[in-house]
Regions:
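Conserved GTP-binding G-domain of TRAFAC-class P-loop NTPases and closely related GTPase folds
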Residues: 2-4, 8, 13, 21, ...
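Conserved beta-strand scaffold positions in the cores of enzyme catalytic domains, especially
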Residues: 28-30, 95-97, 143-146
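Amphipathic alpha-helical transducer elements in NTP-driven molecular machines
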Residues: 51-58, 80, 101, 120-127
Length: 174
């Protein structure tokens, strides 16, 4: 059964850096929502045509399943119902949630070095809105992994539920 790994965390937490490295090192298809904004709008900074962007994103996830491939999803998935959509809409995958936790100031600092900068007030709102995954809240996931990002050094992954994904059995260097 194909596996879906969904990255979860606030902008600037390190989701894209980590998911890109995992995908490259393990031959997993990486699907990032910002890449679909770039594809549809010609620029990842243009957050227009949202409906079309998400339709294309979800269609590519479905194509990944049809092809029997594993995928890693790079999106914020800040709240429970956003995360549940991946399980409800794509029930034929094994579902693995990877939460990256980082101090708010580090997220803001990382954000400043990105091409597509998220305003600080939006990052603050994300932090207020964030529902950190728990075994109780996110009980439908096959596994939940917690990773702390300290000064852009990812700490040893910990399991909240289930087993750690296989790619965390070795050191990941960015």
């Amino acid at each position: 059964m194909p596996k879906m790994y969904v990255m979860c965390g606030i902008s600037g937490s390190g989701k894209t850096s980590l998911s890109t490295k995992i995908a490259k090192d393990n031959n997993i298809k990486r699907l990032g929502i910002d890449d679909f904004y770039a594809k549809i709008n010609g620029d990842e900074c243009k957050h227009e045509n949202t409906f079309n962007v998400w339709i294309a994103f979800f269609q590519e996830i479905q194509n990944t399943f049809i092809n029997g491939e594993d995928c890693i999803i790079d999106t914020n998935a800040l709240v429970w119902h956003q995360r549940m959509q991946f399980i409800e809409w794509f029930p034929n995958f094994e579902h693995h949630l990877i939460f990256i936790d980082a101090p708010l100031e580090l997220q803001k600092k990382n954000n400043q070095s990105r091409r597509r900068k998220v305003p600080d007030d939006v990052i603050n709102k994300m932090a207020e809105k964030l529902q950190k995954p728990t075994a109780e809240l996110d009980k439908n996931w096959d596994s939940i992994t917690y990773i702390e990002n300290k000064e852009n050094v990812f700490q040893q992954p910990k399991t909240i539920k289930g087993n750690l994904p296989y790619f965390f059995n070795k050191e990941i260097k960015l």
